[in-house]
Amino acid sequence: MILVSTTSAVPGALSSPSSPSNSSQEELLDDRDPLLVRAELALLSTIFVAVALSNGLVLGALIRRGRRGRWAPMHVFISHLCLADLAVALFQVLPQLAWDATDRFHGPDALCRAVKYLQMVGMYASSYMILAMTLDRHRAICRPMLAYRHGGGARWNRPVLVAWAFSLLLSLPQLFIFAQRDVGNGSGVFDCWARFAEPWGLRAYVTWIALMVFVAPALGIAACQVLIFREIHASLVPGPSERAGRRRRGHRTGSPSEGAHVSAAMAKTVRMTLVIVIVYVLCWAPFFLVQLWAAWDPEAPLERPPFVLLMLLASLNSCTNPWIYASFSSSVSSELRSLLCCAQRHTTHSLGPQDESCATASSSLMKDTPS
């Protein structure tokens, strides 16, 4: 049996994959580096506030807009992405923060298993909701009639349900891997640890999670974005046969204003594609690289401060998700500005140009098309 100590949702963090012996029992019970503990608490607190505040603001803006009419399909996906990221904040970052503050997991075995399960649900849901959103955007652009026939303005649709269902199902192994276990041979100190029946179990499981949470969604997102860009390019830029037909009919192949419009649309698509893929990879890569390093290398520097802090960055992508999609959706960004403006007005209780700008922002939303 392999007993693995962890303060991460993924087994292998902050420990070596070996059972503690009597000689290492005192080492397990020693106090941690106080400076490192403060750094961990500060990092987790910052991430929690950033995730909760950013996703709460964007979700509030979407709910505020939804009260005035039917939600656009993209708004449905952004709202569920915000819910998934809020689940990361509440069920992953917050328990992790309490756990780091107390050093050991204090709670019954059922709570240990539930926390580990919900931590993984948040990781899967955040990644799969982005993938579902990208797949739906690909269908809407490349297969518009199919997208129209299936709708998409409902608060729950098929891709959203599939993303949540896969997140709940793929997280089930956490319930059987983790439990409250003695950290040493009869030490009397218990922690929420993972146990694998075979020596290769830890490496296989961490690799599986890296593939399913990071690698596979990243490849799917990148592939869909490339196909979307190709479809937009093909629809906006006429091909050789179409240009020849226009010349035979005496039509110009394009005007300067048309070319500028095409260039602007393509530039926005390229920017969005690059931002989505690059930010996704940059946010997830450090966490999974150190997780795989810890699982596969017995000599990994598990106690080094950079290594320990990188183990806590599983929720980094949840800080950036709402701002990426809000910035590329004119309706969401306008609603968010209106919400912040009105909140500032109610806070200051002042009347003047600020109220006028708030009212102007609110009224302009009625003419904004969902994007």
Swiss-Prot record:
Main location as per UniProt: membrane
One Gene Ontology MF term: vasopressin receptor activity
Lipidation (S-palmitoyl cysteine): 341-342
UniProt cross-references to InterPro entries, sorted A to Z: GPCR_Rhodpsn (IPR000276), GPCR_Rhodpsn_7TM (IPR017452), Vasoprsn_rcpt (IPR001817), Vprsn_rcpt_V2 (IPR000161)
Gene3D superfamilies attached to this UniProt entry: Rhodopsin 7-helix transmembrane proteins (1.20.1070.10)
Tissue: Highly expressed in kidney (at protein level) and moderately expressed in liver (at protein level). No or extremely low expression in left ventricule, muscle, bone and brain (at protein level).
A GO-annotated cellular component: perinuclear region of cytoplasm
Stretches that traverse the bilayer: 39-63, 78-98, 114-135, 160-180, 201-220, 272-293, 309-328
Region ranges (Disordered): 1-27, 240-259, 349-371
Localization (cell): Cell membrane
Bias-annotated ranges (Polar residues): 357-371
Composition bias, Low complexity: 15-24
Positions bearing carbohydrate: 22, 185
Family: Belongs to the G-protein coupled receptor 1 family. Vasopressin/oxytocin receptor subfamily.
Function: Receptor for arginine vasopressin. The activity of this receptor is mediated by G proteins which activate adenylate cyclase. Involved in renal water reabsorption.
Listed PANTHER family: NEUROPEPTIDE RECEPTOR-RELATED G-PROTEIN COUPLED RECEPTOR, VASOPRESSIN V2 RECEPTOR
Quaternary structure annotation from Swiss-Prot or TrEMBL: Interacts with ARRDC4. Identified in a complex containing at least ARRDC4, V2R and HGS. Interacts with TMEM147.
Protein name: Vasopressin V2 receptor
Provenance organism: Mus musculus
